[in-house]
Amino acid sequence: MSSYKVVIVGGGPVGALAGLYAAQRGFQVEIYEMRDEYSQVQTATAFSAKSISLTLSERGIKALRHSQCRGLAERILSTTVPVYGRMVHSRSKKRLTSRRIAYDVHGQALYAISRSEINQSLLEELSAFPNVHIFYKHRLNGLDMKQKCATFHNISRPQEPSHETKFDLLIGADGAHSTTRFFLSRYAKININQKWEDIFWCELTIPAGHALPMDCLHMWPQRDFMLFACPDKEGTLTCNLFAPENVFLELKSSGRIVEFFEKNFPGITPDLIPTDNLQKQFKSNLHHPMIDIRCSPYHYQDSCVLIGDAAHAMVPFYGQGMNTGFEDVRILFEDFLDQRRSFPSWKDNLSLSYAMQQKELPDTPQAIVEDYLEQYTKYRQPDVHIINELALQNYRELRQGVFKMSYHIRKHIEEFLSLHAPQLGWATQYRLVAFETMRYTDVLRQVRKQGLILSAVAWSCLLLFFLLCLLSLRL
C-alpha cells in the first residue's frame, strides 16, 4: 500500500470514479462530499441542477472498464436503458408524425441512466476498499497549496471546529460551481470563461404506461426551444423543456402552459401528461439556467488538478458531460499519474522529449508530477474546449437541423461510405464523438476535412452539370 495520499473534493460520479482509480493504485484516498451519504443518489438538490438524465457512451464506458474493478462497467450497463436513436415528433397537416433517426448506421447505442443510479454504483464499489475514506456533509473551507493542506468543515455539526488534512495531490471534482477552483485561482493564474447561456430548463415526467418506444430518445423540436424525453428503467420518461428565459417568464405570467404545449409539442398533453398534472409539474419544478465554463490551466504545481465540470462545465446537448469527465479520470491516471510509480523509467521516457525541447530534465518525483500535470492541462484543454463548443452547436442542430434536407443528405452519404467503404475511415461527427474515443481535436479535424471533400465533390458535380447543359444547347 502506497503512502501517497490523494484527497478528492466532490463525491459525484466523476469524483467517485477518480477515487476508484486512485484506490486501485494503492494510494490513500479521502473523498469529501457536501451532501448526505447517498443523498445524491436519491434526489437532486435545488441548487445542483443535476437531475437531467445522463447517457453513457463509449468514452465513459472505456473509463469504467479501465478502472480495474472487475465487472463494474457491466453491472452499471445492466441498470441502463439502451437507446439507438432519436424519435422526432411533430405535426404535419394536422396529423401527428414521428420519425426515427438512428444514431449510428452500425447499430450502436447510448445507454440512458440516472445520475443517482451510476453514483450509487460507484460509491458502493468504493466502500470495498480499506484505503478509501468518504466524508459526507463536509465543505471545503480553505486550501493551502504550498503546505498541501486542506481545511474542511462538517456542515451537519456547525459548532465543531474545522479539521485539516494533508495531501500529496488534491483533485477538484466538485462541479461547475467548484470551491476548489475558487481556492486554486489564488495560487494559479487561471483564466476562467464563464457564460450563462440563455437556455433554461424544467424537468417534467411522463408516467409509465405510455405508448412511446423505450429504445430511443424523444424530441419535440421548435426553432427557439425544444422538449426532450429520455427513458428510465422504471418505464417512465424524464422530460426536459429547454427554452430561452423569456419563454419561461411568459408562461409563468400568462399561465397558458397547456396551450403552449398543445401548440408546440403535439401529443404531450393530455395524451402523455394529464393537463392538470402538467401545470402542477411546471409550476412546482425549478427552472434552471445553463452555464458554460472553460478554464485554463487545470492544475497548480504538483498539488492540485481540476477534472469534470470543475474544469469544463458544458450544456448537455451532446450527452458528453459525464463521459468527458470520466475520460478526464482515465487520461489523468493512465497517461500521466501512473508514470510517477516508476521514477527512473519515467525520467528515461522524458529524456528524449526534453532534449528536443532543450529543457532541463526535472530531478525529483515532485517536479516530474508538476511537469506531467502541466502536460495534462496542455493535452486536455483543447479537446474539452472543442466539446464545449460542439455541445452548444448541437443544441441548434437538434432544434433546427433535423428538419433540413442538407443535414439528412450529408448524414446518408457519410453513413453509406462508413458502411460500404470502411477503409476510407469515413464517419459522421456524431459517431466520432459518441462511439469512438479519438481526441475531440482529431474529431473536429476529420469532420472539417470530410466537409471540404463533400463540398468539393458537390461543386464539381454542379459545374459538370452546368457544362453538360451548355454542351447540349450547342448541339
From Swiss-Prot:
Q: Which Pfam families match?
A: FAD_binding_3 (PF01494)
**Keywords, sorted A to Z:** FAD, Flavoprotein, Membrane, Mitochondrion, Mitochondrion outer membrane, Monooxygenase, NADP, Oxidoreductase, Pyridine nucleotide biosynthesis
Q: Which reaction does this enzyme catalyse, per its entry?
A: L-kynurenine + NADPH + O2 + H(+) = 3-hydroxy-L-kynurenine + NADP(+) + H2O
Name the source's superkingdom: Eukaryota
GO BP terms: namely: 'de novo' NAD biosynthetic process from L-tryptophan; anthranilate metabolic process; kynurenine metabolic process; L-tryptophan catabolic process; quinolinate biosynthetic process
Entry annotated with the keyword Cell membrane: no
Pathway assigned in UniProt: Cofactor biosynthesis; NAD(+) biosynthesis; quinolinate from L-kynurenine: step 1/3
What's a GO cellular component annotated to this UniProt protein? mitochondrial outer membrane
Major localization listed first in the record, in broad terms: mitochondrion
Report a single Gene Ontology molecular function.
kynurenine 3-monooxygenase activity
| Cofactor(s) in the UniProt record | FAD
E.C. designation(s)? 1.14.13.9
- In which compartments does the protein localize? Mitochondrion outer membrane
Describe the task this protein carries out: Catalyzes the hydroxylation of L-kynurenine (L-Kyn) to form 3-hydroxy-L-kynurenine (L-3OHKyn). Required for synthesis of quinolinic acid.
Record family assignment: Belongs to the aromatic-ring hydroxylase family. KMO subfamily.
PANTHER family under this entry?
KYNURENINE 3-MONOOXYGENASE
Protein name from the UniProt record: Kynurenine 3-monooxygenase 1
User: Whose protein is this, by species?
Assistant: Aspergillus niger (strain ATCC MYA-4892 / CBS 513.88 / FGSC A1513)
